[in-house]
């Protein structure tokens, strides 16, 4: 089957899905259409090397007083040449945000990172945690910045381990950049029993420091954590990874960039100071004026590849793919 013909079949399947979604979901929006189209690209680009699937799982209720578990979405990538008769490590890859989703393109370069991880022998799952775009306005509005989204990433780990017996629960890492790095930090600090190690790249780490340099932060907090959180310093602390630095028990690697204009390096520096003050063993590197700013080690430069090589070496030390 030619590549063009395969693409045509996948696009026709996507159109059928769009028609069904449009009839089933009154909240269909352009982000949702873009998401379905991107799902086709994941399968087209990776179908030759991996079993690519989307799955639904459940998480904490959407509201504080609710009892019904919220339905969540995620991707799984399993290398096609994987020996399913032996145990393998798992990477939980948390995308950035605040509002975004797991997609093939853009500066986050997720497709390249997933491909590299698959080639190294990892199984990968990528949760589109509550607040992600592409699943309708209600799902996007359900964001809980620094809160339940962390549990959503943990839930994707649990679902994969329950579903696939060839995954080793002792060899699971969480990896993320930017807002995904924040989720990685919160998980390794608050749920050390679940993870062998974590990598956080240019992570949102200190929301009070962020509020000091980002005028829009109170608005972001109001929209993504509730009106009462907008100027509540205690809420900023409660939702900040730096607050929990003393709880670190597992290996952690952190990267920052002095020229990052999205997550200022002061956040990473504050995190490093908090970890050092608590006497924690961890690894970190703050690059000086690395070209590419916030995305410097996710692009396709020699420096980016070298930096990702350091990340993969760190992961391999603890996951042994």
What is the predicted function of each stretch?
Residues 156-212:
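Primarily recognizes the serine-hydrolase "nucleophile elbow" in alpha/beta-hydrolase
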Residues 49-72, 80-170, 212, 219:
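Cap/lid segment of the alpha/beta-hydrolase catalytic domain
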Residues 248, 254-256, 260:
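Short beta-strand/loop motif that positions the catalytic acidic residue
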Residues 196-197, 203-244, 250, 277:
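Mobile cap/lid helix-loop segments that gate and shape the active-site cleft of serine hydrolases
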